[in-house]
Swiss-Prot record:
This is Oligopeptide transport system permease protein OppC. The complex is composed of two ATP-binding proteins (OppD and OppF), two transmembrane proteins (OppB and OppC) and a solute-binding protein (OppA). Induction: Part of the opp operon, which is constitutively expressed. The lineage of its organism: Bacteria, Pseudomonadati, Pseudomonadota, Gammaproteobacteria, Enterobacterales. Coiled coil: none annotated. The keyword Methyltransferase does not apply. One of its GO terms (molecular function) is peptidoglycan peptide transmembrane transporter activity. Residues 101-290 form the ABC transmembrane type-1 domain. Part of the ABC transporter complex OppABCDF involved in the uptake of oligopeptides, including the cell wall murein tripeptide L-alanyl-gamma-D-glutamyl-meso-diaminopimelate. Responsible for the translocation of the substrate across the membrane. Plays an important nutritional role and is involved in the recycling of cell wall peptides. The gene is oppC. Residues 63-102, 161-163, 237-267 are periplasmic.
Length: 302
């Protein structure tokens, strides 16, 4: 009897030591993400890049439009204060890279936001309603997806000229199409779940079911795809600017700076190296963060 009592006390003490606090889905995902060294390091580097493009123009002694006539096409020089060098017009490259980074990051993040808002709502409605409505909505999606996008951009530039608003409109037109397809597929499997059927029996409206029950359950996939969409949109904007269809003077982006640097690569290689370096590092960071989020939120890995 004494032995049994002692054993029970030992088991109770052992169970108290092994007691594990319950974690929610997002707490578990955060723990997984923080254990991914590449993703965490990329997040830190991306924060530093965002800090640079925000603060550097404020701290620099040169403005975006200042021209140093005595330092045209000058190599990076600490003494003169042109830490990244100057372009052919004597403008400070550090400030231009920082301002260009703002525009490139803004385009990528704005495209991801459009994809999240429009694509999630469109895809969840299409998948939940089903039937003929789903068929019509998907056919419309296929028509938009088959539209020659480059021709559309050239048409916009021809009629309305080149400005940053057109870039947002053009990229926003295509950024949500794949997101809508992905969310629709997730919704088709979710709408057969018991909690959706219970909401239907309880008389909950379609809008409430989509917003309160379906959308929160597809957020994991949405977050992962959005994080991988940002670098694609940044690269796409850079490609448009490189071709002369995107951001142009007096504004600039990393793609426009790459285009300028490529023309004088043999004479002034720093004009190409600095914007290219920032662009490549940013793209790698977003991709590593996307991979980390996918590993953290993928239900097959839990």
């Amino acid at each position: 009897m004494m032995l049994s009592k002692k054993n029970s006390e030992t088991l109770e003490n052992f169970s108290e030591k092994l007691e594990v606090e319950g974690r929610s889905l997002w707490q578990d995902a955060r723990r997984r993400f923080m254990h991914n060294r590449a993703a965490v390091a990329s997040l830190i580097v991306l924060f530093l890049i965002a800090l640079f493009v925000t603060v550097a123009p404020m701290l620099s002694q040169f403005t975006y439009f200042d021209t140093d006539w005595g330092m045209m096409s000058s190599a990076p020089d600490m003494a003169s204060g042109h830490y990244f060098g100057t372009d052919s017009s004597g403008r400070d490259l550090l400030v231009r890279v920082a301002i260009g980074g703002r525009i490139s990051l803004m385009v990528g993040i704005a495209a991801a936001l459009v994809a999240v808002i429009v694509g999630t709502l469109y895809g969840s409605l299409s998948g939940y309603l089903g039937g003929k409505i789903d068929s019509v909505m998907m056919r419309l999606l296929e028509i938009l997806n088959s539209f020659p996008f480059m021709f559309f951009v050239i048409l916009l530039v021809t009629f309305f000229g080149q400005n940053i608003l057109l870039i947002f409109v053009a990229i926003g037109m295509v950024s949500w199409l794949d997101m809508a397809r992905i969310v629709r597929g997730q919704t088709l499997s979710l709408k057969r779940k018991e909690f959706i059927e219970a909401a239907q029996v309880g008389g909950v409206s379609t809008a409430s079911i989509v917003i309160r029950h379906i959308v929160p359950n597809v957020l994991g996939v949405v977050v992962v795809y959005a994080s991988l969409l940002v670098p694609s949109m940044i690269l796409f904007e850079s490609f448009l600017s490189f071709l002369g269809l995107g951001t142009q003077e007096p504004l600039s982006s990393w793609g426009a700076l790459l285009s300028d640097g490529a023309n004088s690569m043999e004479v002034s290689p720093w004009l190409l190296l600095f914007p290219a370096g920032f662009l490549v590092v940013t793209l790698f960071c977003f991709n590593f963060i996307g991979d980390g989020l996918r590993d953290a939120l993928d239900p097959k890995d839990r």
